[in-house]
Amino acid sequence: MSLFSEVAELALEIDSYELTALDRTFESGFTRPSTLITLNGGGESGRGEDVVYDDLDHIAHRDIGPVHDLSGPRTLGEFCELIGGLDLFADAPPIRDFSRRYRRWAYESAALDLALRQAGRPLYEVLGRSLQPLNFVCSVRANPAEEGDAEHVLEPIASRLSKSPGTRFKLDPQPDWSDEVIDWLLASGAVDSLDLKGCYKDTPVDVEASPEFYERIATAFPEAWLEDPEINEETTPVLERYRERVTWDAPIHSAADIEALTWKPRIVNVKPSRVGGLEDLSEAYEYCEREGIGAYGGGQTELSVGRDQIQYLAAMMHPDTP
């Protein structure tokens, strides 16, 4: 029986739902919009977090309010089927189409939370699994190289290591990193993975791909995972040599996406909100287990229950990876 089948028959009763703003502005000036979805029923409440990135999408969602009738489904499976047929951006289409997956995850994770509370059972028990201690990696961006010397570039990493020695990092390498920056990072022994940001286009975070850049980074950090490179005619010959360390995040929305990758990976980043629906997430986890592909998890700067939920799933599905 599939993971989804195990939870689909959970009884579910929904009387009402609420939308609550959770936006937060960080010291860097970045504002993370977020909306808490709360489903109420049977004297319990289940919560999920909408991690869509665009402010206007959140504003439109909150302004229109709880307009959908979610009271019909009597099981979690029926609820997921209903959500799959609803336009959760009824007031205005999303700025980015993949945001539909993020919002679907918010509603379906809230429904799973509610169904489990109404049943009085934890998820690991329903699935016949166990929870294990997690390994965490800190994802952080170095300071821009053009704004100072190596000490300035490395300050976000060095300050964290001074407070928590032994911390390991997922970093976003840049073509303008100096030899001094790379040598310091290598000597620290703290680099777990390097996000090449090659699968993003026209965003504030994408990094221009080049065979020279990829060769330099792959050679400098011989034990680090190389996440999300751009594959093209120029970079493929370089990446072929390091394919055992190449992993993926941004392109992964389903089991089919994992199967369609250029090379069968040793490990991939399975983000529940990026996948979207509970059934699709179940299929992605099961595909990885069946094919002997490892999974690790990553966040979307969740501000509330979304962070707890993805950590719970990681502790149950892939506790030995970050």
Place the predicted regions along the sequence by residue.
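Catalytic core of soluble alpha/beta enzymes
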Residues: W177-A314
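Hydrophobic/aromatic-lined pockets within catalytic cores
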Residues: T31, L116-A119, H318
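Metal- or metallocofactor-binding catalytic centers and their adjacent structured scaffolds
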Residues: N40-A119
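Active-site-facing alpha/beta catalytic cores
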Residues: F98-I231
